[in-house]
C-alpha cells in the first residue's frame, strides 16, 4: 500500500548528537476512492529507530496539496525531532473540503482521513495507535476538514485544531468548489446545513476533544471562527480560542502552527 518515490534526509545537530528526521512522499491506497493518495510523512529520529511516537495530521487548504505545510514551515523536520512527533500531511484532492461527498461518490475524504490513513500510519510509520496520541489540524479548508473529521470521528482523534478555518461554509456558496460536492446552496440548504462544522458542534461534550482554534482578525473567515467560539461557549465545551493580528496567508500560518503544536504536545504529555 506504500511506495516511496522521494526521500529527503534532514540532518540536524542537536544537544545529544546528530539526528536525522526523515521526510517521505508516499502513495497510500484508498479503498473507498479506489485510488492512491499522495501523503507527505515526517518521522523523527526516534520513530526511525523503532520508538512509537504521537502523530499530528496536517491538512492543507483549497488549491494546495500535501506539500503545503512543509512550504509554510520548512523546519517541520527539526520540530519533529525536537518534539518527538510524527507529522502526516495528506493530499486533500485540491478542493475536497475533506467530506464524503453525497454527490461525487468517488470523493470519500472523510473516510480516507479518519479511517484509511490512520490505519496506514499506525501500521507503517511507528505512530502510537491510540486516539490520546493523535491530533489533527489544518489551515483554511484544512481547518474545516480537521474539525469536521475530529468531531465526527471522536474515536479516532483526541485533539483537534483549526487555523484560519472555514468553519461555517454557508456564507460562501460560490467559493472554493464546494457546490461541486454538496450542490448549490439555495437548492440544497439541508445538505449545506449538515456539511458545515458549526452545525456539528452539538456532537461535542466538554472534554471529549482537546480543541484549539485561531484566526487572524483581518481574515475573511474571522467572523465564522468567532461564531464557532461563541457557540462552543454556549455549549460549555472547553476550548482555546486565539484571535490576533493577521490575515489569510503563509505568514500567519507560519506563526500560528507553533501555538497549535505546543497545545498538542501538552495534550499528548498529560495522558
Identify what each model region corresponds to.
Residues 1-6:
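Positively charged n-region of N-terminal signal peptides that target proteins for export
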Residues 7-17:
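Bacterial N-terminal signal peptides
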Residues 21-271:
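Non-catalytic cap/lid and distal C-terminal segments of serine-dependent acyl enzymes
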Amino acid at each position: 500500500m506504500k511506495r516511496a518515490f522521494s526521500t529527503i534526509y534532514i540532518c540536524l545537530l542537536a544537544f545529544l548528537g546528530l539526528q536525522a528526521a526523515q521526510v517521505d512522499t508516499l502513495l497510500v491506497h484508498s479503498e473507498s476512492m479506489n485510488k492512491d493518495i499522495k501523503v507527505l510523512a515526517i518521522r523523527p529520529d526516534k520513530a526511525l529507530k523503532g520508538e512509537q511516537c504521537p502523530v499530528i495530521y496536517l491538512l492543507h487548504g483549497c488549491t494546495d496539496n500535501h506539500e503545503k505545510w512543509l512550504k509554510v514551515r520548512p523546519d517541520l523536520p527539526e520540530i519533529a525531532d525536537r518534539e518527538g512527533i510524527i507529522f502526516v500531511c495528506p493530499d486533500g484532492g485540491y478542493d475536497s473540503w475533506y467530506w464524503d461527498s453525497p454527490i461525487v461518490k468517488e470523493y470519500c475524504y472523510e473516510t480516507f482521513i479518519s479511517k484509511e490513513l490512520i490505519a496506514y500510519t499506525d501500521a507503517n510509520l511507528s505512530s502510537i495507535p491510540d486516539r490520546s496520541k493523535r491530533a489533527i489540524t489544518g489551515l483554511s479548508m484544512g481547518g474545516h476538514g480537521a474539525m469536521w473529521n475530529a468531531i465526527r470521528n471522536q474515536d479516532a482523534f483526541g485533539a483537534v485544531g483549526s487555523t484560519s478555518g472555514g468553519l461555517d461554509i454557508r456564507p460562501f456558496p460560490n467559493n472554493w468548489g464546494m457546490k461541486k460536492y454538496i450542490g448549490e446552496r439555495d437548492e440544497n440548504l439541508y445538505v449545506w446545513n449538515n456539511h458545515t462544522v458549526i452545525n456539528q458542534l452539538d456532537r461535542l461534550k466538554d472534554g471529549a476533544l482537546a480543541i484549539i482554534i485561531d484566526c487572524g482578525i483581518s481574515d475573511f473567515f474571522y467572523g465564522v471562527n468567532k461564531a464557532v467560539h461563541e457557540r462552543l461557549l454556549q455549549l460549555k465545551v472547553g476550548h482555546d480560542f486565539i484571535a490576533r493580528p493577521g490575515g489569510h496567508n503563509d505568514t500567519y500560518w507560519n506563526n500560528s502552527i507553533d501555538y497549535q503544536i505546543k497545545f498538542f504536545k501538552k495534550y499528548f504529555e498529560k495522558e
